Amino acid sequence: MINFNFFMNDVVRQAREEIVSAGYTELTTPEAVEEAFKRNGTTLVMVNSVCGCAGGIARPAAAHSVHYDKRPNHLVTVFAGQDKEATARAREYFEGYPPSSPSFALLKDGKIVTMVERHEIEGHEPMQVIAKLQSYFEENCEEL
């Protein structure tokens, strides 16, 4: 029989590695969130999760959406259910949006511009989420 904690630790490790290998910086403390969010420019925040729609839709969309002429200056991630304090601090910036994971938040100069919430991810194809993110990049980001 598989040890559940061992299994979940492996799932979490793989989820972390997948988003970091896509070029996102992990924010694991409230202080790291503060530091990242006070930077000028645009920041895409991927709220990571261990749910199926995170692995099958959100993380692939996070990886592929940034291959676009206009993209955010900064790519960061917090992990809901794992780095709880960092995630809670990040969500304080997402005014007007209820907590959801997985999700994406686009910030400009530390202020929320828009979000792609779980209900816009779950049940959708990765390409639909990529297209939505890239439309936000087109409106709010500059060519890098």
Swiss-Prot record:
Superkingdom, taxonomy of origin:
Bacteria
**What InterPro entries does the record tag this protein with?**
BrxB/BrxA
Q: What's a BP term from Gene Ontology annotated to this protein?
A: cell redox homeostasis
PANTHER family, per this entry?
BACILLIREDOXIN BRXB (PTHR40052:SF1), UPF0403 PROTEIN YQIW-RELATED (PTHR40052)
Q: Which family does it belong to?
A: Belongs to the bacilliredoxin family.
User: Any idea what this protein is called?
Assistant: Bacilliredoxin BC_4151
Q: What is the organism of origin for this protein?
A: Bacillus cereus (strain ATCC 14579 / DSM 31 / CCUG 7414 / JCM 2152 / NBRC 15305 / NCIMB 9373 / NCTC 2599 / NRRL B-3711)
